[in-house]
Design a protein with these regions (language model features):
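Short loop/turn segments that flank or connect secondary-structure elements
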Residues: 1-117
């Protein structure tokens, strides 16, 4: 396990969780993720990525929601947990993410090689 893999795991543990509304995919748009996070995910074809991008969607959004929910990237986990990425349906954790943790996540994302999900 690399230092970045350990850091990803550490940061994930600090992000609060909440229950999404079934069928909502508002957070499932095209985003960039660290190459380390991308390496954890099943490989999608270029055609699958292109089709999703044409719909301004995520290649991992399936008919029943996120196909990679347990391995979803940090940016996906942040959605709805911070005032800067509020859920438009009003869903949120009991306590929003600590501002220091959010800054730490953004610093990590800024310091790592980003690729389009």
């Amino acid at each position: 396990m690399t230092d970045n893999d350990r850091k990803i795991n550490q940061l994930r543990a600090k992000i609060p969780t909440f229950r999404c509304i079934k069928g909502c995919h508002d957070c499932c748009g095209p985003v960039t993720v660290s190459s380390e996070e991308m390496a954890r995910l099943p490989v999608k074809s270029n055609a699958e990525h292109d089709a999703a991008l044409n719909e301004l969607s995520c290649a991992y959004l399936g008919a029943h929601g996120c196909e990679i929910y347990d391995q979803r990237p940090l940016i996906c986990r942040l959605f709805g947990t911070t005032p800067s990425l509020l859920c438009p349906n009003g869903q949120r954790p009991e306590y929003m993410i600590d501002v220091k943790v959010e800054r730490e996540i953004h610093a990590f994302l800024g310091a790592t090689r980003q690729v389009l999900l």
